[in-house]
């Protein structure tokens, strides 16, 4: 579960960064061809290798039933609370990936190669967290473990904000604070996802889809809000205050 949810957390983060990096070496049409080929391969593998987990009841697909299940999921407070908690916890990382090229390359004068290396600790924090949860934590769903992850996240956000206020021209504080926050989020994300998925009797596929709908919609909106805050409402400090508020929420 920890590995799967870490993939869910990393995929929207690594994808845009990998695409931006590959555009330095490949034509954009070739990139679209690669994406299409990989999507076709994933579709074929799902058709031939996806295990069947639901016993057939001799009924066809009924859109009305699917819609009613989604309505029930959206009316479930645990599902919505979990989806919003996951979305807010992921916001500082997603907005950092979206705006860090502007902050570090355009405004900070960093080379693209150096910029790519600055993202390694951020992704490394999530990967290390998933390894810790999978290998060393016996009961990650215990309240004690959950409360122990929160100070890691808040410390990362405070390092991010305080370091940039004290040393505004040093990129190290942005990267180190975001990396520490990514470590805390990687520890907490699988637990929150599991709580939202299994704390009720609703169909798990519907609940997972509901969580992803909320999270992806929130992600798209948060990137636009963060972009406006950075360019129109105060620059880097205002942007990092937004990350701190999201982490606290």
Predicted regions and their residues:
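Helix-loop-helix hairpin linking two adjacent transmembrane segments in secondary transporters
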Residues: 3-48
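Structural signature of transmembrane alpha-helices in multi-pass secondary transporters
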Residues: 4-16, 42, 89, 122, ...
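Small-residue (Gly/Pro/Ala) motifs that create kinks and tight helix-helix packing interfaces
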Residues: 11-23, 101, 133, 222-230
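Pair of pore-lining "gating" transmembrane helices in MFS-fold secondary transporters
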Residues: 75-93, 179-180
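Helix-to-loop junctions at the C-terminal end of transmembrane segments
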Residues: 129-144, 230
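C-terminal transmembrane helical hairpin of 12-TM major facilitator-type secondary transporters
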Residues: 144-190
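A late C-terminal transmembrane helix in Major Facilitator Superfamily
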Residues: 193-232
């Amino acid at each position: 579960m920890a590995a799967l949810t870490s993939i869910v957390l990393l995929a929207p983060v690594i994808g845009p960064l990998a695409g931006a990096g590959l555009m330095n070496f490949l034509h954009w049409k070739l990139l679209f061809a690669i994406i299409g080929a990989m999507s076709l391969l994933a579709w074929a593998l799902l058709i031939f290798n996806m295990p069947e987990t639901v016993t057939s009841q001799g009924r066809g697909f009924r859109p009305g039933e699917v819609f009613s299940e989604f309505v029930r999921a959206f009316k479930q407070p645990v599902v919505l609370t979990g989806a919003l908690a996951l979305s807010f916890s992921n916001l500082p990382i997603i907005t950092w990936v979206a705006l860090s090229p502007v902050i570090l390359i355009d405004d900070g004068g960093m080379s693209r190669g150096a910029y790519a290396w600055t993202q390694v600790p951020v992704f490394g924090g999530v990967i290390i967290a998933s390894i810790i949860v999978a290998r060393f934590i016996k009961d990650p769903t215990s309240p004690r473990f959950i409360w122990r992850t929160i100070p890691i996240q808040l410390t990362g956000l405070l390092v991010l904000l305080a370091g940039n206020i004290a040393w505004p021209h040093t990129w190290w504080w942005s990267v180190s604070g975001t990396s520490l926050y990514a470590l805390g989020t990687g520890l907490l994300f699988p637990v929150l996802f599991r709580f939202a998925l299994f704390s009720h009797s609703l169909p798990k596929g519907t609940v997972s889809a509901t969580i992803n709908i909320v999270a992806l919609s929130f992600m798209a909106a948060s990137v636009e809000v963060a972009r406006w805050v950075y360019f129109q409402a105060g620059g880097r400090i205002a942007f990092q205050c937004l990350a701190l508020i999201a982490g606290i929420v």
